[in-house]
Amino acid sequence: MFSRVALRAAPRQQPFSLVARRTFQTTRAQLSSPYHYPEGPRSNLPFNPKTRFFWFRYLMYCVVGFGSPVAIAVWQTYRPRS
């Protein structure tokens, strides 16, 4: 139930503590990393979000994706029983 790191980080001579001490560091992005692209942001996407009608295509994608399950549920709820 408790994190092993929290249990390991608790000192034995002090009262038992379940809080793990974390240190966050900030470093510059390593360009040799597979998670950072030297071409810049949006270079790894399979579509171009800077096109003229991207907003419309994205809106239609969301409407179809979120609207289809709702429309199917409503249709199945109100269809006549056979």
Curated annotation (Swiss-Prot):
What sections of the protein cross the membrane? 53-75
- Please list the residues that make up the transit peptide in this record: 1-31
- In which pathway is this protein known to take part? Energy metabolism; oxidative phosphorylation
Report the domain of life of the source organism: Eukaryota
Compartment(s) of residence = Mitochondrion inner membrane
What do the Gene Ontology cellular component annotations say?
mitochondrial inner membrane; respiratory chain complex IV
Enumerate the UniProt keywords alphabetically: Membrane, Mitochondrion, Mitochondrion inner membrane, Transit peptide, Transmembrane, Transmembrane helix
- Give GO BP annotations, semicolon-separated: mitochondrial electron transport, cytochrome c to oxygen
Q: Matching Pfam families, A to Z?
A: COX7C (PF02935)
Q: Which residues lie on this side of the membrane: Mitochondrial matrix?
A: 32-52
Per the record, ranges on the Mitochondrial intermembrane side are: 76-82
Q: Which membrane topology describes this protein?
A: Single-pass membrane protein
InterPro entries assigned: COX7C/Cox8 (IPR004202), COX7C/Cox8_sf (IPR036636)
Q: Which family does it belong to?
A: Belongs to the cytochrome c oxidase VIIc family.
What the protein does? Answer: Component of the cytochrome c oxidase, the last enzyme in the mitochondrial electron transport chain which drives oxidative phosphorylation. The respiratory chain contains 3 multisubunit complexes succinate dehydrogenase (complex II, CII), ubiquinol-cytochrome c oxidoreductase (cytochrome b-c1 complex, complex III, CIII) and cytochrome c oxidase (complex IV, CIV), that cooperate to transfer electrons derived from NADH and succinate to molecular oxygen, creating an electrochemical gradient over the inner membrane that drives transmembrane transport and the ATP synthase.
Protein known as:
Cytochrome c oxidase subunit 8, mitochondrial
Native species? Neurospora crassa (strain ATCC 24698 / 74-OR23-1A / CBS 708.71 / DSM 1257 / FGSC 987)
Provide the gene name from the record.
Answer: cox-15
